[in-house]
Amino acid sequence: MSTPRSGCEILCIGTELLLGNILNGNARWLAESLASLGIPHFRQGVVGDNPERLGEAVLEAASRSRLLICTGGLGPTPDDLTTETLAACFGVALEERADVLADLEAKLRARGRSLGSSNRKQALLPQGAEVLPNPTGTAPGIIWTPQPGFTVLTFPGVPSEMRAMWQQTAVPWLQAQHLVAGTFRSRLLHFWGLSESSLAESVAPLLELQNPTVAPYACQGEVKLRITAHGATASKAEAAIAPVEQELRRIGGEHCFGADDDSLASVVLQQLRSRNQTLAVAESCTGGGVGSALTAISGSSDVFLGGVIAYANRIKQDLLQVPSKLLEREGAVSAAVATAMAEGARRQLGSDWGVAVTGVAGPGGGSDSKPVGLVHFAVAGPDGCSHLERRYGDRRGRDWIRGLSVGDALNLLRLQL
């Protein structure tokens, strides 16, 4: 007895994905959208531009899933084989669609091009398939039910085209088919200064919840907790999330710095704006990483004045006015020099706050007293200075140390504001 088809799966097509030449952002985006729509999503796959293996993947999906979403392989080149392979899998002929052909000609004409044989291929669709229009590109997709209880939706691999087609046509179609049962909502909380294991231990009872669910994961110093709830309506799902979020924030205390799209940099910038204050940075081992994190956010210039990458001791002296005797006595990687750098940045750039980072990022340059992974941080503000020392160790390498240092510098400032 065969198992009834259920749920949805995503199949991303392209040899470039298998080779790691590009990241598979389409699968992630579609998975999030399916979750928000309340459509059960059980599997994801990646297959190269090979018709035999693609056909095997399609038939496997047809044996177990109600809905297959394919991205990629709809272009005009010979290795774009998605449509042809789908038709062959189910023994259906391709037919040239006059409406698709006219749309292709119009789009190419607007770009000063004529319709060639390669583009004409994009007007060939399986008999009985519904066109899934592409408002921004030339490659149309299809909505096709080749077997009772099994539907395929195809999209180009270009993310902007795929997203426009999904939102404008696919989602309304899915809703009309009553495939959308209720809705999911999620909330992502961000924590800094805790390990994933320690936070998971602190919130252990909440990790056992079923609706909403709470799932932890870590990313270079930051720990995230995603709360996901299902409800008949968005408001009911959000109502289920609210008390759990409140409890997680209470447990996390000052380690919880934001939610959803917040970052340490965005939170710090907002804190500075609310106080009508400004910031300057002085960096050594991070090489501009703190400034880069801040300027990655549009509009940061209203509070972030700038910074000095003081890698050499001479620059620390000349631009930040760190005393030469202090450098000789304490060394560049020290609490005293970090404090002098923060004060120098604040004074020289005329800001309300100064942040400094100096450390040994490795792999060389360490000593018994100042090993690789030792980093000193300082924040200078209207009411004085604060200092933080971290010993990251050398197991994970230079980039890891520098990345954590950027986060710890911003977090130290956040806690002072």
UniProtKB/Swiss-Prot annotation:
SMART domains per record = MoCF_biosynth
Give a Pfam family name.
CinA_KH
Query: What InterPro entries does the entry give?
Result: CinA (IPR050101), CinA-like_C (IPR036653), CinA_C (IPR008136), CinA_KH (IPR041424), Competence-induced_CinA (IPR008135), MoaB/Mog-like_dom_sf (IPR036425), MoaB/Mog_dom (IPR001453)
Extract the CDD domains matched here. cinA (cd00885)
The record's comment on protein family reads: Belongs to the CinA family.
Protein's name according to its UniProt entry: CinA-like protein
